[in-house]
Every structure is written in C-alpha cells, then in structure tokens.
Amino acid sequence: MINKINMSHLKSSDYKERVNALRRWLRGERLNAYVVPTLDPHNSEYLPFRWQTREWLTGFTGSAGLAVVTLEKAALWTDSRYFLQAEEQLAGTGIELMREGMPGTPDVAQWLEATLGEGGVVGFCGECMSKELFDSLFAGLSERIAVRASDNDPFDYLWRDRPDMPRTLLSLFPEEYAGLSAHAKLQAVRAALPAAPGEEKRLFIMNDLSEIAWTLNLRGGDIDFNPLFLAYLLVTDDAATLFTDRHKITEEERAYLTREGVAVDDYKAWQYVARELRTGRVGETCVYLPASVNMAQLEAFEQAAEATDDVRLEVIPSPVPPLRAVKTEAEREGMRAAMLRDGAAMVQFLRWLDEEVPKGLQTELSIDKKLTALRAEQPGFKGLSFPTIAGYAAHGAIGHYEATEETAARLEPRGLLLLDSGAHYDCGTTDITRTVALGPLTEEERRVYTLVLKGHINLARARFPEGTTGLELDLAARYGMWQRGYDFGHGTGHGVGTYLGVHEGPHQIRKNCRACTLVPFADGMTVTDEPGIYVSDRFGVRIENVLLAHEDGATDFGNFLAFETLTLCPIDLRPVAKELLTGEEIAWLNAYHDRVRVALLPLLANVADKAWLEAATRHI
C-alpha cells in the first residue's frame, strides 16, 4: 500500500479551481480564512491517504507545509528543503509561496493580520490541528481576529473521492522481540503519570500511534513506511481501552488484549468518555492529555472540566517516549539481528552497483527498486522504513530528495552517489546512508567525504559521562568540519524504533536544540550518527549508522557511557583521503570493517559477494 495521491494528470488550473471551491465553502460557513496543515488527528509524521488534504488542495507534495486560503488570497509556508519544489508545483495555482525563515517572510499570524480586516474569522479542522501547532500559529494573533474549529470538514464535501479510513488488520509484536508484555508497559505508563493531588482517579488519553503500538505490542499497516494503526488508547489506574476500528482485530488479537487487561471500543468512542465526565457521575478525576493532543479532543475534555468541579484537566508531556527510548535486552538483540539481514542485502546491492554503473543503464529509481528487491529476500522483511533517497551528483545535495520518473538521473561512472535507505524487519528497523564513489572523484569530493567520515567516526567513538545530552554530543561530529569552514543544516542523530517509526524521540543529537538539553543519553538508547556536507548544485556526502548507547564503566568522576555501532555495512574506502585521518580514526575504521566482514561473510552464499566484501573491508 502506497498512500500517494496520483496527481500526474492534473494542471495548475485544477488546483486553482480547488482553492476557489474552498472559498465558496468558506462563504457558506461565514469564515474569512481556512488553515490546512500537514496533519492527521494523531500528529503523525506520515499521513494516511485520507488526511493528505494540503497536498490534494495545493498540488505541493513536500512532507512539510501549511496552506492558508482566504476569500481573496492563498499562501503556502514551507521550509528551505522544499523552496525549489514548491515554486515549481505552485506555479499557476494562484497560491503564493512563503519561504519560512527567510528575511521578509511573515509568519501565519502576521499574514492573517495583514490580510483580514477586523472581525475576520479563521477556521480549521479541530481533529487535524494539534495543540502544539495551534499555539505556535496563533499566539501572535490580535483579538481583532477570531479563530475557531469548524463544525464541518470541508474536504468531506470538496474531495469527492476522498479515501475512507484505512482498515488493515493488526498483528502481534511477539514478547520475545519486545522484551515486556503489554500489561507491564501499561503499568510503567501508570507509574510515570503525575500523581493525583488527592483521591482522584487518573485518566490518560494516548493519541500518538507509535506510542499506542509500542505500549500494546501491536503493529498495523494504516500508514506507509510505519507499522501503525489508527487508534486512541485510554489508560486509567486499573483499566485500559483501545479505541479503533473493530474490523481490524481478529479473534486472536481480541483474546490477547483481554489477557493483557485491555478492552476494545470503536475508534471515536473516546468522545463518550468526555461526555460521561461532563455529567459529574464519574467522580473526581484527573484527566491527563498529551501535548500532541488535537484541538477537537482538547475542547471535548475542556468542556467536561468546565461542566463539573470533579474533573481536573492537565496537558502533559506523554510519559511513553522516555520509556520507549530505552530498549530492552530483547529489543537490542532484535535490532542487531535486523542489522545483520540488512547488511547482507546492502553488500549484495553494492557489489551489483559496482558492476552495473559502467554499463550506463541504471538510474536513481532503478537502483532503489533493486535494493528493495534484495531486502525483500531477507527473512522477516516487512517493508521500507521511509522513502529511499538516492541522489546522484547534484541531487545528493538536495535535502530529502526523492527521485521521480521525471527527475531521476542516470548514473555515470564518475562522481558520488548518496544513498539513504532503511527497512523494517520483524525484529527491528534499520536506517543507513552510504555515499559511494561511482568513478573518478575531484580533490574536493575526496576532502569533503573524508571530513564527513571523520565526524562520523568521532561521534561513534565518543565516551561521555552519564547525564550528557545530544546538544553536547553534536560537537563531536561537527568540530572537524567547522575547522575547515563546513557545516550541515540537519540534525546529527535521531532515535530509531524497534519495528516502529524510523524517527523516534525524545532524545536526539542536534545543535541549537533546547529540547536536546532535556533528555540525557542513557544505557539502551538507539540513535543515528549521520553527519553530512552538501555542496549546492554539485554533490552531497552523508554517512549514517545506527548506534546503541551502553554503560562503559565508572571512574572517580562518575559513570560513563559509550556507543556500540549496530549497523553492519562497509563504508566506501575509495573516496577516503587517508592523509586527513588520524591514527585513531584509521584504527576505528579498520576495526569496524573487521566486525562487518566477520559478521556478514557467513550470510553470503554468492562467491562474488564474498570477494567484494573482503575487498571492501580491507585495512587502509
């Protein structure tokens, strides 16, 4: 299932008409503007087809963006990764591109103030507006403009063939891979919730799909690249209820949930919980909502709190991400097993690539298909963990580049190919980037590649005291680049789920990141190590492995941690400028390749693959 809107047959005039149709709806609703974010009711990173409304309305296919339509104007905000793409896709639609972060670009509130007169009313879909986004969008709006959730979703009327809710079946994630039962995880969630000030009962509504899947040891298929399912989860001090489409659940899963102490109800039945609280018959209750709660849910429970003194409402950070971030021993072993399978597929692919490039027949799209096919041959393969980024030459310098039939470059036997890919297996998730030399390189390409490699190695080698955060660790990857006048704009590392989302928090490694100071690294946390340098219009370099933080002894100065590199795949040695590496960096690279060779050789049946691996992991 690939949830992409087929828009290849549409013209800019079609999107102009869709915007005009929304304007007609606005007049009927007595609204002056409507906000269309890139969100679903669960604040998901990847959206089910049904909620790709911004893309349907505007024709802009980037993963980040927000559209606002008024009775006379329309605008779309996106970040620097998508400026060029948005400019091309919005041409002729009448939608103005707002380049976030650029001088002179107003934010949404400023634009609405300048566009709407006094008494203007801005509408939005309450289900598809998180509290976090609402606060950031409208905090600067004056009282002369009103903002309210609309009672009706315009896309139910305008999008005539709008997809239904996905209804893929659920599956169990075995405890042998999870390491903890659902019952044990529910108990951990309860223990992590704030204590009630008195004798009140506690009630927590979970709306993040990856948190629900992790807590219940269940997986689904409602969202591309993520083994998730649409649901809410209610957790009280002594019970739990899963709100989801009952047709997703087989008798096996229903019996399993009953054993774990979880009842099942319809997807939107959480609304009855809010209504029951409003009656005052439930008794004194502390209702905790996560910071990612959507505005429709927040309003429903706010009404309950306003209706009776028995209900106290508080929005809190979800207790689940810190629990999920520390992997159990079973999860760690599962991730190691997934890396072995993925490494074998990568070796087969890289050997094939070396043979194919000189023939001049392969493109960015064709190599993606080949790599996916090789991964699919591995036991327990469940699908890709994100859309593959295969960027040859100048395309490697484009953030989040995704090749299409129109843009896919043909690979030539020279220059660099940046390949960022990953997969889900039944026991774990992978995320790996390799930059590969396809032929002769310039001195600049070799220098940049080696600087990225140095940063990658220095983070992988880091030993650090307990309590160290990702903000502090970020310098390990960037310091050498900074000395040469290079840098990169994205984060250095993110958590990785266990057959869950490839992007997982709350920890991360990133500069200029206040949130990174709040969550120190701990034994059992996974994180990517992915520094890069991107030379605009020429080439890009990124090298990425997944790391596992582990205890590394104690000294008079406290307990220390270090990283185990989980990813097992050769790092291309052909672009390396050895003279730029220190002796310690060379020793790390040789030792890593020894590990890769010993681990992967037994998994390869093809003699040519074995020979390629031996050569690719030679000492330098």
Language model segments and positions:
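Active-site neighborhoods and metal-handling regions in enzymes and metal-associated proteins
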Residues: I2-I620
